[in-house]
């Protein structure tokens, strides 16, 4: 007779949800094995059995964040205007980060990565949405990837500055600055590839 499973997929998902909410509300420092277990109605040993460590639990939150991020970017409508679509992706990127800054911070925090068994796939899904949008303007795959990386760096830098409180103005003024910067710099990155 097979041994019954002590911890199932539902508990794994519940622990991930509890840790995600703790990060969203209070930042990564709020995640402890004991507090996550208590909030999920289980024991710390269940967290260790399912995730191995606090760091692996946070890495799972990061991976989940990238999955959510890719899904969010994929909802941006594709129109007949690829430049407008890139701008819309940039605004969606910013909107995702501003809606849940703690979660966003964990996704990109130094040393927090999805884990050994899934090293880059979740980040790549996010990047591929952008690269595919750029490829409509830049047919060469290598150039499209380079431009996409440049655009990602641009929007990530702008969002990081805004989240750090370094972009002056109220919400509307910051949005206008963001859009103006994308409009000024984005086309230059695309033009440098010869299109």
Task: Name each region found by the language model.
Residues 98-115, 160-168:
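Amphipathic alpha-helical segments used for helix-helix packing
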Residues 114-139, 145-150, 172-187:
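Amphipathic alpha-helical packing segments from all-alpha helical-bundle domains
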Residues 23, 58-65, 107, 115, ...:
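Alpha-helical DNA-contacting segments of helix-turn-helix folds
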Residues 153-170, 185-194:
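Amphipathic C-terminal alpha-helical segment
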Residues 14, 18, 22-56, 60:
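Helix-turn-helix
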């Amino acid at each position: 007779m097979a041994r019954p499973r002590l911890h199932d997929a539902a508990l794994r998902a519940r622990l991930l949800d509890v840790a995600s909410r703790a990060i969203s509300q209070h930042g990564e420092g709020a995640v402890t094995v004991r507090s996550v277990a208590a909030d999920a109605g289980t024991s710390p040993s269940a967290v260790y059995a399912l995730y191995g460590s606090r760091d692996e639990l946070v890495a799972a939150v990061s991976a989940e964040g990238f999955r959510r991020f890719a899904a969010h970017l994929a909802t941006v409508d594709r129109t007949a205007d690829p430049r407008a679509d890139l701008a819309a992706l940039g605004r969606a990127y910013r909107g995702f980060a501003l809606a849940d800054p703690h979660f966003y911070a964990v996704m990109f925090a130094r040393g927090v990565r999805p884990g050994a068994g899934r090293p880059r796939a979740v980040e790549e899904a996010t990047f591929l949405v952008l690269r595919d949008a750029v490829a409509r303007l830049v047919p060469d795959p290598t150039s499209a990837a380079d431009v996409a990386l440049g655009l990602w760096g641009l929007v990530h830098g702008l969002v990081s500055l805004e989240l750090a409180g370094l972009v002056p103005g109220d919400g509307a003024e910051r949005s206008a600055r963001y859009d103006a910067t994308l409009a000024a710099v984005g086309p230059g990155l695309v033009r440098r590839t010869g299109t």
